[in-house]
C-alpha cells in the first residue's frame, strides 16, 4: 500500500530556518519550493539549502517544486534533485501530459505531481 499525503506544507527553499521548522511539522509532506517563493537572485542559495538537507530519517515526505520546464533555472533544479533524498517533484505551469512525460524521462522513477 502506498501512502498518499493528506496535508502538504509548502516552504521557501531559501530559508534554512523555515525548512527546519517545516520538517518538524505534522504535515504529511513538505514541498521545498524553488519556484515562485524564491527570488531569482536567491535560486542558487535555495539549491544549496536542499543539498545540505542530507538523508531523511522519518517525518514527512520531502517533495520539491521546481521551476517550470524551459525556464532558465529548470536544469539546475533537476541536477539538485538527482542527488537529493526526495519522494517526488511538483511541476508547476505544466501545459499537459507531454510535460509530465518529458520530466519523467529526465528523472527516472521519481513521482511527479503536475500543477496545470
What does each of the following model-derived ranges do?
Residues 2-116:
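Conserved alpha/beta-domain cores
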Amino acid at each position: 500500500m502506498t501512502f498518499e499525503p493528506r496535508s502538504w506544507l509548502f516552504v521557501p527553499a531559501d530559508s534554512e530556518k523555515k525548512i527546519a521548522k517545516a520538517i518538524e511539522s505534522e504535515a504529511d509532506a513538505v514541498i521545498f519550493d524553488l519556484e515562485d517563493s524564491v527570488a531569482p537572485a536567491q535560486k542558487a542559495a535555495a539549491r544549496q539549502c536542499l543539498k545540505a538537507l542530507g538523508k531523511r530519517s522519518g517525518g514527512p515526505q520531502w517533495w520539491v517544486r521546481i521551476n517550470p520546464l524551459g525556464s532558465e533555472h529548470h536544469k539546475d533544479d533537476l541536477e539538485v534533485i538527482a542527488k537529493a533524498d526526495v519522494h517526488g517533484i511538483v511541476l508547476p505551469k505544466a501545459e499537459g501530459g507531454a510535460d509530465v512525460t518529458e520530466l519523467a524521462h529526465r528523472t527516472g522513477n521519481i513521482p511527479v505531481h503536475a500543477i496545470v
